[in-house]
């Protein structure tokens, strides 16, 4: 079986998540994917890196303002502001969640946006989040392309994971819904809703 894997996942290495009112070490961390990669290598499966498909396939699933928020977050978070004269160099966890059902107005403030686009306080945004999530999406897309090229079995080892991510919400350790991105990519390439065995 062919495995698609990228070391960029190491860039998402949050220090803590909020669990039951206590900051705890992040459960979802690089060692999880490293263990799987080691097992894949030990089994003798071939491994390739992802190819860059750009942001267009990501934007086919996720809203543009959300993708822009994630791509520019760290630069905005770390610049000097009224909250920090020297800028913030620590992981970001939301402290407020602007209620979307009352007002569909995206906050302009970075702290407001952090809550607006998140569903929990257990998914830290770090300096390397964009690099890791972009690489994870490219991994899924490369796996989809290899299936299109006739490969019989492909394992896209995506980290951070993506199954909890919505069109414009992150949480549950997930930022981009890699499975949805790959599925939409396959649909856009002419595949039916179901692949034949």
Which positions does each model-derived feature cover?
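HDAC/HDAC-like amidohydrolase catalytic core signature
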Residues: 1-197
């Amino acid at each position: 079986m062919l495995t698609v894997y990228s070391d960029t996942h190491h860039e998402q290495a949050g220090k803590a998540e909020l669990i039951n009112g206590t900051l705890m070490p992040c459960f979802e961390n690089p060692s999880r994917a490293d263990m799987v990669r080691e097992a894949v290598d030990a089994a003798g499966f071939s491994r390739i890196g992802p190819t860059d498909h750009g942001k267009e396939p990501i934007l086919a699933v996720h809203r543009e303002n959300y993708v822009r928020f994630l791509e520019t977050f760290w630069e905005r978070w770390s610049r000097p502001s009224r909250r920090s004269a020297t800028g913030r160099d620590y992981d970001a966890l939301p402290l407020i969640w602007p209620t979307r059902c009352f007002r569909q107005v995206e906050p302009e403030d970075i702290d407001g946006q952090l809550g607006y686009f998140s569903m929990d306080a257990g998914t830290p945004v770090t300096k390397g989040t964009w690099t890791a999530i972009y690489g994870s999406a490219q991994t899924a897309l490369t796996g989809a392309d290899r299936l299109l090229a006739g490969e019989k079995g492909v394992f896209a080892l995506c980290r951070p994971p993506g199954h909890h991510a919505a069109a414009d919400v992150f949480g549950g350790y997930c930022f981009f819904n890699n499975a949805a991105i790959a599925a939409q990519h396959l649909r856009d390439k002419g595949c039916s809703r179901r692949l034949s065995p």
